Design a protein with these regions (language model features):
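Functionally critical, cavity-lining and gating residues within the transmembrane helices
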Residues: 14, 74, 78
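Short, flexible loop segments at the rims of nucleotide/cofactor-binding pockets, characterized by
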Residues: 46-51, 75, 147-149
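Asp-based, Mg2+/Mn2+-dependent phosphohydrolase catalytic module
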Residues: 57, 61-64, 68, 77-179
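Crotonase-fold acyl-CoA enzyme core
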Residues: 71
């Protein structure tokens, strides 16, 4: 794969990513077949593999005990996100789950963050967006949301740009307890 392939996938919809793969790599499969193949891998990962990062549950428990309202705003399909949240027993910490598909816009637009804010009923200036992808951090920052980032190996290529936009940066979830 090309070295910047993750950059393209982070910013594109599933269909857009399939078009990119088809054109870039000359794939013979239809866009629908490519999407189906990619989704089966994603479904497996969310249903069976993805684990919480160390100290995530402790952080969620502390926030919940402090009465902090939380919801999920994700680019992931609802069924995949729910499968992981339920399997990891952390769905209970969130009052709602919003997906880009259901909102009708990717995280290059602030729609999902605005919907989450409306649901939570909290002031924008105290409603932190936790993000790990540069395009979503840029969107949340431009929409005047405070942004918290946790250093992520998957986002290492964008680390400097993410840090420049973040209001709070933590090296890991364990560091949250020091705030």
């Amino acid at each position: 794969p090309e070295p910047d392939i993750r950059y393209h996938f982070k910013r594109l919809t599933m269909e857009g990513s399939a078009h990119y793969m088809k054109e870039t790599y000359g794939l013979e499969q239809s866009i629908e077949e490519i999407c189906t193949g990619v989704m089966s891998g994603i479904e497996f990962a969310y249903r069976d593999c993805i684990q919480c990062k160390p100290s995530v549950v402790d952080m969620l428990e502390a926030l919940s005990n402090a009465g902090v309202a939380m919801c999920v705003a994700t680019a992931t399909r609802r069924d995949c996100a729910l499968a992981a949240l339920e399997r990891l027993d952390i769905l209970k910490y969130f009052s709602a789950l919003f997906t880009c598909t259901e909102v009708g816009a990717s995280k290059t637009e602030p729609d999902i963050f605005e919907l989450a804010l409306s649901h939570l009923g909290t002031p924008r200036e105290t409603t932190f967006v936790f993000e790990d992808s540069l395009h979503a951090i840029e969107t949340a920052h431009a929409a005047a949301f405070p942004v918290m980032i946790i250093d992520e190996p998957a986002s290492a290529s964008d680390a400097e740009a993410c840090q420049a936009l973040a209001d709070v940066r933590l090296k890991n979830f364990t560091a949250f307890s020091t705030l």
